[in-house]
Amino acid sequence: MTVTVLATLARVYVDDLDVALPTFVELTGEQPRLRFTYRDLDLASVGGYLLLAGSREALAPYRGTHATTIVESIDQVLRLVEEHGGELLDGPNEVPTGRNLTVRHPGGATIEYVQFHAAARATLA
């Protein structure tokens, strides 16, 4: 079973998104493709990075997640977990960019998977 991966973003946890963004814009030479609020977090994707900003308390539940992977289908990820093991930690959930879930895979890697809705998916082009 193969999961169709559209992109993988390195997660960077920051105190203040407005302070952090200029550095990542300069680093990547790109403007933020997405910027949104989810729960108590401010998020933006710039180049290959997903910046997550919030208080120490707000970020605490997310710090153990190693990457965000954009996939064609959340259902493919669920089948992968069923076939290869792993633990569904959260989701599937409706989020501002589509649907997500978080999985701890055998070996310990914890990955957030997101299936973008059409508007968010257009930012990948």
Predicted regions and their residues:
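Vicinal oxygen chelate
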Residues: 1-3, 7-15, 57-125
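Generic beta-strand hydrophobic packing signal
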Residues: 8-10, 35, 92
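Conserved short beta-strand elements that form part of the metal-binding/catalytic scaffold
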Residues: 30-64, 110-117
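Short alpha-helical
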Residues: 18-19, 41, 75-76
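Conserved acetyl-CoA-binding loop of GNAT-fold acetyltransferases
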Residues: 26-33, 85-87
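N-terminal beta-strand motif that seeds the catalytic metal site of vicinal oxygen chelate
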Residues: 1-21, 65-67, 117-125
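Conserved active-site tyrosine of GNAT-family acetyltransferases
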Residues: 20-25, 81, 108
